């Protein structure tokens, strides 16, 4: 599966009614429209540090997505009829660290829970997918092999994104995927096992940028509450 960050939704404008309306009815319409707009807006995209952890949240502003940082390495996100978003907490820079995480992940539709990060030189977007909804994100990639790590087999895939948004602007870059065959929400992710397996397949990483345990959703609804440590 390729990342959907290059997709953006265009909003349609509603024409005003030509006939006059009662003031009370007009007032109700305006308040309702403003309320629905606020719901659609959700949380704006942002990055930074929170309680000692780096966080990143990106949305294409489709549907409703509410992301909230919590204590320590915790965050929560609720989404409804969303476009595409990805957000979570972790570290900057990333490394071949051992990551522990716990929480809940309840998607309805296409979403996944994943270790997510970027490197530069080469520019690579990578995923170590722990859980997913109705769509296996490896289906859109090229199968390269598998690796056993932390109690399960992970299938390895690559995909190429052309002129797509990245941490360096719109670029062409490669995605690396490890997708866990037995889904879970919580446990240990030994990232070095994946990085080493990728390297043996000729999938080189560069200089690490940020690395988070992320929730990503595409045209779906759901909720997620995750703590990394």
UniProtKB/Swiss-Prot annotation:
State its location(s).
Secreted
| Residues annotated as glycosylated | 30, 100
What is the enzyme's class at the highest EC level? hydrolase
Q: Which reaction does it catalyse?
A: Endohydrolysis of (1->4)-beta-D-xylosidic linkages in xylans
What range(s) does the GH11 domain occupy?
41-229
**UniProt superkingdom:** Eukaryota
Q: Which Pfam families does the record associate with it?
A: Glyco_hydro_11 (PF00457)
EC number, as in UniProt: 3.2.1.8
Q: Give the range the annotation lists for the signal sequence.
A: 1-18
- InterPro entries xref list: ConA-like_dom_sf, GH11/12, GH11_AS_1, GH11_AS_2, GH11_dom, Glyco_hydro_11
Which residue positions are annotated as catalytic?
125 (nucleophile), 216 (proton donor)
Named in its record, the pathway it takes part in is: Glycan degradation; xylan degradation
Query: Which GO-annotated molecular functions does the record name?
Result: endo-1,4-beta-xylanase activity
UniProt entry keywords in alphabetical sequence:
Carbohydrate metabolism, Glycoprotein, Glycosidase, Hydrolase, Polysaccharide degradation, Secreted, Signal, Xylan degradation
Q: Tell me the function of this protein.
A: Endo-1,4-beta-xylanase involved in the hydrolysis of xylan, a major structural heterogeneous polysaccharide found in plant biomass representing the second most abundant polysaccharide in the biosphere, after cellulose.
* Family label: Belongs to the glycosyl hydrolase 11 (cellulase G) family.
What name does UniProt use for this protein? Answer: Probable endo-1,4-beta-xylanase A
Question: What organism is listed for this UniProt entry?
Answer: Aspergillus clavatus (strain ATCC 1007 / CBS 513.65 / DSM 816 / NCTC 3887 / NRRL 1 / QM 1276 / 107)
């Amino acid at each position: 599966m390729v990342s959907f960050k290059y997709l953006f939704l265009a909003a349609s404008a509603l024409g005003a009614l030509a006939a006059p309306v009662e003031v009370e009815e007009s007032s109700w319409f305006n308040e309702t429209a403003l309320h629905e707009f606020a719901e659609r807006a959700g949380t704006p995209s942002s990055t930074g540090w929170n309680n000692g952890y780096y966080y990143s949240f990106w949305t294409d502003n489709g549907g409703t997505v509410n992301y909230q940082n919590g204590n320590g390495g915790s965050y929560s996100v609720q989404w409804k009829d969303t476009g595409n978003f990805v957000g979570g907490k972790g570290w900057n820079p990333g490394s071949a660290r051992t990551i522990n995480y716990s929480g809940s992940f309840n998607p309805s539709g296409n979403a996944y829970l994943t270790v997510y990060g970027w490197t530069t030189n080469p520019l690579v977007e990578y995923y170590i997918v722990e859980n997913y909804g109705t769509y296996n994100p490896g289906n859109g990639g090229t199968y390269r092999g598998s690796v056993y790590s932390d109690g399960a087999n992970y299938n390895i895939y690559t995909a190429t994104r052309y002129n797509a948004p990245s941490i360096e602007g719109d670029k062409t870059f490669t995605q690396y995927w490890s997708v866990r065959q037995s889904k879970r929400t919580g446990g240990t992710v030994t990232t070095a096992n994946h990085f080493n397996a990728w390297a043996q397949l000729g999938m080189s990483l560069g200089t690490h940028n940020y690395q988070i345990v992320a929730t990503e959703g595409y045209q779906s609804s759901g909720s997620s509450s995750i703590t990394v440590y």
